[in-house]
Amino acid sequence: MSVYTTAQLLAVNEKKFKFDPLFLRIFFRETYPFSTEKVYLSQIPGLVNMALYVSPIVSGKVIRSRGGSTSEFTPGYVKPKHEVNPLMMTLRLPDEDPQNVADPVYRRRRIILQNMKDEELAIAQVEEKQAVSAVLSGKYTMTGEAFEPVEVDMGRSAGNNIVQAGAAAWSTRDKETYDPTDDIEAYALNARGVVNIIVFDPKGWALFRSFKAVEKKLDTRRGSNSELETAVKDLGMAVSYKGMFGDVAIVVYSGQYVENDVKKNYLPDLTMVLGNTQARGLRTYGCILDADAQREGIDASTRYPKNWVQLGDPVREFTMIQSAPLMLLPDPDAFVSVKLA
């Protein structure tokens, strides 16, 4: 038995629970929900012969010999779920005024909304993890509810994943005399288009700015109204805009996700990503596999939130948000990923 309507839940979820991860925000700006379980790449406007190479993962190992190229794919299904615990309605909420105690009805609403916030965040973290992995390596492992893990490979050229080593490692260079500009320009040649942004993790940024030449060339002045600088400024606690290095914006990303109750960084230590804010990243979604959604005429959607009461002894109440996300890069060579050393 439904409690809140889907329209109410969608409105609350959209207005109150914005999640603004960097890679999704600036590199994946097109959204394509499908009314079918599969995502059909041929139906996305402007794509020409895009295909994914999908390989099964057995015992943690990618078996490419059992994989194949496909232009249609069923995304993993995610549906974080919480119970609305009646005991929590008898307890004072953390921010509740002891002199003005709220009634259980108000507490129940607050608990439902907090559950939804947690569920939305869980899905958004999956989306950002896919987006970051697509940019870093051109592939990622797809997992989901009742879904055997597979590797989704978008076909990144080997030359676009660079590992510094030996004499080329920045850590071995003289910080007073060496200028890393030539290295960056050489790396950028591997990108399919023009590079207008570089994203570092905090340790990669610390290594880059340790060069005196960088200190001299980095323009940290504010006040530009350019579309690029507007796009990368003021994105929250996890993102720091450092300035312009020539005509390239420098951004440091310290975003994290939670896996098995452990916080992990989206970007590995000593990472540098060269890209363009006009790169065409796609947020695609398979249909919602829920009978209630079908009855309501909701199939092609990025989310399906629901709140319902399950009859029985005792009666139980739940919240859940469902989604089938698949983040894609039609041109994975628009980016160059560098492992600094």
Curated annotation (Swiss-Prot):
Assigned keywords, A-Z: Capsid protein, Coiled coil, Host cytoplasm, Late protein, Virion
Quaternary state and interactors: Homomultimer.
GO CC term, one of those recorded: host cell cytoplasm
Keyword Coiled coil: yes
Physiological role: Assembles to form an icosahedral capsid with a T=7 symmetry. The icosahedral capsid is about 60 nm in diameter and composed of 415 major capsid proteins. The assembly is primed by the interaction between capsid assembly protease and portal dodecamer, and major capsid proteins assemble cooperatively to form the procapsid with the help of capsid scaffolding protein. Major capsid protein forms hexons and pentons of the icosahedron. Viral genomic DNA is packaged into the procapsid through the portal vertex. The packaging triggers a dramatic reconfiguration of the capsid shell.
Highest taxon above the source species: Viruses
Coiled-coil segments on the chain, per record: 109-129
Pfam families: Phage_cap_E (PF03864)
Protein name: Major capsid protein
Similarity section: Belongs to the lambda phage major capsid protein family.
Cellular compartments annotated: Virion; Host cytoplasm
The keyword Lipid metabolism is annotated on this UniProt entry: no
Transmembrane annotation, as ranges: none
